[in-house]
A protein has these predicted regions:
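Active-site-adjacent structural elements in enzyme catalytic cores
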Residues: 2-106
């Protein structure tokens, strides 16, 4: 049996002001996990570019690499380095519906 000791640092930062948003950004830059309210539930997120943070997120959720978490992006340009190729149909949907509730699996 393989057990892993993991210290998870989780922050719940209310984003009611610019200072709150700046604190949330610092927490993410520092590799911490962050509680994020969505339109339906609270999620746990991290900086997708921080491999250590992603490992802590997977451990906190009891998941392995076979069930990776989604990566949320604010702009199509943010996909550079995340996906190998963005199909033209997906790009057209992004341009038509972002920002907004559009989920794409690439």
């Amino acid at each position: 049996m393989n057990t892993m000791s993991t210290e998870t640092i989780l922050s719940a930062v209310p984003c009611l002001s610019e200072d709150d948003l700046a604190r949330a950004q610092r927490e993410l830059r520092d590799g911490h996990l962050l509680v994020v309210p969505t339109d339906t539930v609270y999620g746990i997120g991290c900086n997708a570019a921080d491999a250590g943070a992603v490992e802590r997120l997977l451990a906190a959720k009891g998941r392995g690499r076979q069930m990776p978490p989604p990566v949320l992006v604010a702009d199509p340009a943010d996909l550079t380095g995340i996906v190998a190729r963005v199909p033209e149909a997906a790009r057209a949907l992004m341009e038509a519906f972002w920002p907004g509730a559009l989920t794409l699996i690439l």
